[in-house]
């Protein structure tokens, strides 16, 4: 999985207010503990 905003954007992922979404269909809560969701970005 992408580990930062740049990598996430490169694979077309995004992170909303509560949910992370990646092309691999991985879903996760946006929390400081999640490597790709340390802050809110879309």
Curated annotation (Swiss-Prot):
Localization (cell): Secreted
Residues annotated as signal peptide: none
Keyword flag DNA damage: no
GO biological process, one term: defense response to bacterium
Keywords, comma-separated and alphabetical: Antibiotic, Antimicrobial, Defensin, Disulfide bond, Secreted
InterPro entries: Defensin_beta-like (IPR001855)
Source species, domain of life: Eukaryota
Disulfide bonds: 8-36, 15-30, 20-37
Gene Ontology CC: extracellular region
Role summary: Has antibacterial activity against the Gram-positive bacterium S.aureus 1056 MRSA (MIC=11.48 ug/ml) and the Gram-negative bacterium E.coli O157:H7 (MIC=12.03 ug/ml). Does not have antifungal activity against the yeast C.albicans 3153A.
Family per record: Belongs to the beta-defensin family.
The protein, known as: Ostricacin-4
């Amino acid at each position: 999985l992408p580990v930062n905003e740049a990598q996430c954007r490169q694979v077309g992922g995004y992170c909303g207010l509560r949910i992370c979404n990646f092309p691999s269909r991985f879903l996760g809560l946006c929390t400081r503990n999640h490597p790709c969701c340390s802050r809110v970005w879309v």
